[in-house]
């Protein structure tokens, strides 16, 4: 009995240390690896520089078994309130979508306090430009490029999709993005009422220009917005209002709220150990795959 107690105590201590020393997204990475999650996909490029001036890098994930046909592409932007996060902690996302048949590009971007709006959007646009110029080398189809992101990353994905200036200024051809999915992203959050949003956006002279919903348009590519009904970080109203506005304009938009899921649950549900939380991965992958084929 004493030995059993010692073993249990050691496990508890190890788990406590794990949660304290390892960033939450990277915990999902480690658990995903331990469970052999999405072993049909792998990282095929690491630390590729896409913006030399600012030292920005990206990783590429792809299915291990690829045929002759080029694959659809997903550029995924991770979250972190515009001030935290790094691509290395989100390998579980890259593997998950690559196992669904995508070539996945996971870029970093600059954050507060080093930069503020709109610099992180410009970094995202530069990553998409890299995809335009290079993704064929990794088996990706530059005619089937999609975007997605969680939280602040969902914001970046939506701004690149709706506000034409970012991709245009980066040299990306019009119509390059075929579809976009936002997971728990902030799209309509005036007035700035949190420390994170104030620090990221307060200095911009026209606050409305920071809001994705202000750029909703009838000719936007298909957009899906996902949220959790128990998200207290980025309120579900952001997704509700964005979908409503796109529908009013005649754009193709889908909305889904997952019962009882929180802000963190939405990204956790992409990791293999937690997919029972909700069909986030299947729903988003299917939407992107189907709409990447549109004319």
Locate predicted features.
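Short beta-strand/loop motif that positions the catalytic acidic residue
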Residues: 225-227, 231
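Primarily recognizes the serine-hydrolase "nucleophile elbow" in alpha/beta-hydrolase
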Residues: 129-193, 208
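N-terminal cap/lid segment of alpha/beta-hydrolase-fold proteins
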Residues: 23-67
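C-terminal catalytic histidine-bearing segment of alpha/beta-hydrolase fold enzymes
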Residues: 247-295
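Short beta-strand element of the alpha/beta-hydrolase
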Residues: 69-80
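Catalytic nucleophile-loop/oxyanion-hole region of alpha/beta-hydrolase
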Residues: 85-89, 93, 100, 105-142, ...
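Conserved alpha/beta-hydrolase "acid-adjacent" motif
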Residues: 232-238
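Mobile cap/lid helix-loop segments that gate and shape the active-site cleft of serine hydrolases
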Residues: 35-40, 185-215, 221
